[in-house]
Amino acid sequence: MDHLQLAAHTFSSRLILGTGKFSSAAVMLEAVKASGAQLVTVALRRFNREQLEDDLFGPLSELPGITLMPNTSGASTAAEAIKAANISRELSGSPFIKVEIHPNPQHLMPDPIETMEAARVLASEGFLVMPYISPDPVLAKRLEEVGCASVMPLGSAIGSGQGLASAAMLSIIIRESSIPVIVDAGLRAPSEAARAMEMGCSAVLVNSAIAASDNPAEMAAAFRDSTDAGRRAFKAGLMRESREAVATSPLTSFLGEQS
């Protein structure tokens, strides 16, 4: 069986779901179920047992087979991310942490310097660190070297729906990484998830494309199927591209004639 391996944790699904932007917790839960996802990311601010309408941890923790990956969204420095990670681990008991540090709310690009520092500290404290980064092959390798469980380069800007605008750099990261590469952010269509998997990504994380659709549960199922199809295609091996046409049938002896 072809599984996603993150440190000592094994998942049969290669689709990871984000839980923001949904119209309600009920809609989000239906999408999670339809997606088949086993790893789900939740912002620290959604761990709120005092105000149940804001709490996603409770409902998600009741779903069988779901592992939570808290994230540090909202942090603008390494210190803030480290603090959020430790609070999240206390609340959830999960060893996973998605390090997400984007100080500029206009473009939401991840801060590479603060991300590197937070990842280094958290990995040394026993977290399974999953850093959200720009598609920078050098940074990805450095994060691997400090002990991250995976790297999560963006396909394009968060919520932009611009797809795999960073495909060229993603290809380099995939080729040079010894840890899983998970495309995170910017995917709009299931076909883009399939393409990411065909490139050799280990998994994809999707949120806005599902939450903002007219039918989130149906879109989640579509991403489930396309992610699986892309992975199967990658494992099977895509045919090589050619600059010229290559005949699929013989061009000689047509109806007994010799060319």
Swiss-Prot record:
SUPFAM superfamilies: ThiG-like. Its EC number is 2.8.1.10. Gene3D superfamilies: Aldolase class I. InterPro entries: Aldolase_TIM, Thiazole_synthase_ThiG, ThiG. Coiled coil: none annotated. It is found in: Cytoplasm. Keywords: Cytoplasm, Schiff base, Thiamine biosynthesis, Transferase. The active site is at K98. It is an enzyme of class 2 (transferase). Pathway: Cofactor biosynthesis; thiamine diphosphate biosynthesis. 1-deoxy-D-xylulose 5-phosphate binds at G159, A185, G186, N207, S208. It catalyses: [ThiS sulfur-carrier protein]-C-terminal-Gly-aminoethanethioate + 2-iminoacetate + 1-deoxy-D-xylulose 5-phosphate = [ThiS sulfur-carrier protein]-C-terminal Gly-Gly + 2-[(2R,5Z)-2-carboxy-4-methylthiazol-5(2H)-ylidene]ethyl phosphate + 2 H2O + H(+). Pfam families: ThiG (PF05690). GO terms for biological process: thiamine diphosphate biosynthetic process. The keyword Lipid metabolism does not apply. GO terms for molecular function: thiazole synthase activity. GO terms for cellular component: cytoplasm. Homotetramer. Forms heterodimers with either ThiH or ThiS. Belongs to the ThiG family. Catalyzes the rearrangement of 1-deoxy-D-xylulose 5-phosphate (DXP) to produce the thiazole phosphate moiety of thiamine. Sulfur is provided by the thiocarboxylate moiety of the carrier protein ThiS. In vitro, sulfur can be provided by H(2)S. This is Thiazole synthase. It comes from Chlorobium phaeovibrioides (strain DSM 265 / 1930) (Prosthecochloris vibrioformis (strain DSM 265)).
